[in-house]
Amino acid sequence: MIFSKLIDRYALYDLHKKRSGEFQYTSLSNTALDIKDIEFFYKVQPSNIHFNIKHAKQEKEYMVGQFKYKSSVQSGDSRNDSVTGELFLHENEDAPHVIFVHGWRMDSNERVKKIFHDHMTNLKWNMYYFTLPYHFERKPNQSLFSGEYMVSANIERTVQATRQAVADLRTLIKWIKANKNGPLILIGISLGGVITNLTALVESAIDVLASIFYANRLSYSIWKTNPGKFIRKDLEHHGVTYNDLIDYWKITEPSQALPKVKKENILLISGKHDLYVHREDTDYLWASWEKPTRYIYTCGHAGIVLKRKKIATDTINFIQNRLNPPHFPNVML
């Protein structure tokens, strides 16, 4: 326990070396944030999506490239409003299609790849690395670091960024389902787990969901955990209380409804000593979702690195078990 917390504390010290140079809070507009209809809020706008696969090259049995498409939720920043990502398409399109969603403030997908990529390449599965709003190449020029604008003291922008993330992810899911064969797997890590869990509330095309070191309530994460302390300071300076934030960000909580994914096809993984994501918050989601399969590791948030072999093994074993007959009788693994 002491070792896990020491590593998390060192990582948090490093995290806070980069922080916003000025307050991000902006006064709320007249637009009400009391949103109840999640189906409407997170809907995918009907459109003829032109899905670009560029810079493609062949690597063994894989076509490797990048994808890019226009977000259906426009923020007004041209960089952020272009959805981007990497893809690794196997010759066998009947193999599972796995979408990965990275964590908050990550600079690349390298941590995610180090957990899963080689294992899934050996399995000959198709892989898509999705980029969250305001991260990587979606980071606006004026932003100081990847992810600065996705979760911040700008209350409405955080809500809209969450909405954009879910809508963008659903667009990719629907494109895969319309153009490829094979089951669809969604894997989220940290903030990516929040987004995949939210997506599961409104998207029925997900066959298996795995959420790793996920949070549940952004309001809790900002107010109660160390990673959010400077955002909380910004909010408190402008008179926002914890109860205010709970109300404003209610629509971003995965625990607000049951997912459309079958309970037996959901895997949740948490760290017992996580200083980024508290057990109280992860327990809340687990109970709200009627207690799907859950693994609790003896580690902190740094388990993303220290426990990556176990994460990969447990997650892939769970997926394979769910894809075996009688769950998916036509799937060839």
Question: How would you describe each model-predicted region?
Answer:
Residues 105-109, 114-163:
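Cap/lid segment of the alpha/beta-hydrolase catalytic domain
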Residues 197-242, 296:
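Hydrolase active-site cap/lid region
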Residues 187-192, 196:
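Gly/Ala-rich beta-loop-alpha elbow adjacent to hydrolase catalytic centers
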Residues 261-262, 267-270, 274:
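Short beta-strand/loop motif that positions the catalytic acidic residue
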Residues 300-312:
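Catalytic histidine-centered segment of alpha/beta-hydrolase-like enzymes
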Residues 275-281:
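Conserved alpha/beta-hydrolase "acid-adjacent" motif
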Residues 95-103:
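Short beta-strand element of the alpha/beta-hydrolase
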Residues 1-68, 330-333:
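N-terminal targeting or regulatory segments adjacent to alpha/beta-hydrolase or S9 domains
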